[in-house]
């Protein structure tokens, strides 16, 4: 299926980069009967969708993305027959748990009513926040996960937008209990910026919506299984994939009517800068990247011994204790500091997927936010946070593998300074990333498009950046109009 030397034939379209967005773009184009080539610099496809034995033999670790709530609610991915190509999701009983110092934990479950009820005094407030979004989601999903335009359902979109454009701290004021405030803060911190900033509520609301619609699943066998299913489906349609080929200039590529690049603005300038207008080049140079991450994978002798039993039912555990603690951690990181008690996002896939570790053994995956480009080792700080809520954790570590922001970027050039969202998701870069244009997917050069997480709707494994860019190219270049 994969080759290493580019052929000289012509193509209708070429996609550079085989992350989830590159794969989505390639599939969308190939579904229309075009001749499509997908080019990847590495020996394997997938971008952030890769699974490797990073620590010890038999221990499979997700190198980048691990838990996939956005994949299963993606309007594009959900239409693809990926199960036929080997993709099977596992749904932990609890989507996410949030432990506290007193030995208890708040939980996010697939049932909105159950989640609300467990929040006790904040039951009504939680339902008031989430019920309208879940009711409207079928109407607004495509709108939320695309570029800024006049919506087909303006009232439903307005109801969501008023909440989504808010700061996370303002949404937290809806709740009275420390537990509800903290659970919300953990969701909102996925925005990877201070919780006091406008728009930080958006990601938290979408992630909670995903939990109540489908759950927060993990692919059996590892995140690479998503890329494998997508690529196999693409080639089954007649698409061609070439690996081990790094593109540094458009001149390296065969001729094509359209080229879609699953890259950041920085790489776009390197590859196609000579074809871009001076104004568009100026816009791309102004594009801002967000905080980075420091990541650890562990091979464990036994499961993480969380004090709160609910954590043992969760695929994801948010470690940050309180709203105040998480606000402080994220603000310090934004200011260029390294928190003593960082907010930690942890996944424990092997509790639910026995293919991830040898019998009786386990894996865990975690990261914390750090200043962009930081090379500080946060291992001790992260492990202290886990140990805080799971005494005895460190005694169960058999081996570990760490990646700082520099190592993450070396592994995947789209992770600039360790930024896993493809750029800061600020008010000015939420819908207009990477530049303010009628279509953010078009560059200033005809036939050249950007389809990475640096375009709307941003980071996450959903493929919508690639799908939206491919729709734009189909309309512009091939006069093919896709409604949804």
Model-assigned labels for residue ranges:
Residues 207-248:
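Helical element adjacent to the flavin cofactor pocket in flavoenzyme catalytic cores
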Residues 5-135:
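N-terminal glycine-rich phosphate/pyrophosphate-binding loop and immediately adjacent elements
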């Amino acid at each position: 299926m994969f080759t290493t030397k580019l052929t000289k034939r012509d193509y209708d379209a070429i996609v550079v980069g085989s992350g989830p967005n590159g794969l989505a773009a390639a599939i969308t184009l190939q579904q229309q009967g075009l001749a499509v080539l997908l080019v990847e610099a590495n020996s394997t496809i997938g971008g952030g969708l890769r699974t490797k034995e990073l620590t010890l033999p038999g221990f499979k670790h997700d190198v980048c993305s691990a838990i996939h709530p956005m994949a299963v609610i993606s309007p594009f991915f959900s239409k693809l027959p990926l199960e036929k190509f080997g993709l099977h999701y596992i749904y932990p009983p609890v989507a996410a748990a949030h432990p506290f110092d007193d030995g208890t934990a708040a939980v996010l479950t697939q049932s909105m009513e159950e989640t609300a009820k467990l929040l006790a005094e904040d039951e009504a407030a939680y339902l008031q926040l989430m019920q309208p979004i879940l009711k409207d989601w079928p109407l607004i999903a495509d709108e939320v996960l695309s570029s800024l335009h006049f919506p087909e359902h303006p009232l439903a979109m307005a109801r969501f937008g008023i909440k989504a454009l808010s700061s996370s701290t303002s949404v937290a004021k809806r709740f009275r209990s420390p537990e509800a405030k903290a659970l919300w803060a953990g969701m909102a911190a996925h925005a990877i910026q201070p919780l006091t900033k406008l728009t930080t509520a958006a990601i938290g609301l979408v992630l909670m919506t995903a939990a109540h619609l489908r759950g927060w699943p993990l692919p059996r066998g590892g995140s690479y299984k998503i890329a494998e299913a997508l690529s196999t489906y693409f080639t089954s349609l007649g698409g061609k994939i070439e690996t081990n080929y790094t593109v540094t200039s458009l001149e390296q590529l065969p001729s094509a009517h359209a080229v879609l690049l699953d890259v950041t603005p920085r790489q776009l300038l390197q590859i196609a800068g000579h074809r871009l207008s001076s104004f568009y080049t100026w816009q791309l140079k102004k594009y801002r990247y967000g905080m980075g991450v420091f990541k650890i994978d562990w091979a464990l002798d036994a499961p993480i011994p969380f004090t709160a039993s609910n954590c043992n039912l969760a695929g994801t555990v948010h470690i940050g204790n309180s709203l105040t603690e998480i606000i402080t951690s994220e603000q310090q990181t934004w200011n260029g500091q390294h928190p003593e008690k960082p907010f930690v996002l942890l996944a424990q896939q092997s509790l639910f997927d026995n293919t991830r570790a040898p019998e009786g053994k386990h894996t865990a995956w975690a990261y914390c936010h750090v200043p962009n480009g930081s090379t500080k080792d946060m291992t001790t700080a992260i492990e202290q946070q886990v140990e805080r809520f799971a005494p005895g954790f460190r005694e169960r570590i058999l081996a570990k593998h760490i990646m700082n922001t520099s190592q993450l970027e070396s592994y995947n050039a789209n992770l600039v300074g360790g930024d896993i969202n493809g750029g800061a998701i600020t008010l000015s870069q939420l819908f207009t990333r990477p530049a303010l244009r009628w279509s953010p997917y078009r560059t200033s050069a005809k036939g050249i498009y950007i389809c990475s997480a640096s375009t709307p709707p941003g980071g996450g494994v959903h493929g919508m950046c690639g799908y939206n860019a491919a729709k734009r190219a189909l309309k512009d270049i091939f006069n093919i109009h896709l409604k949804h």
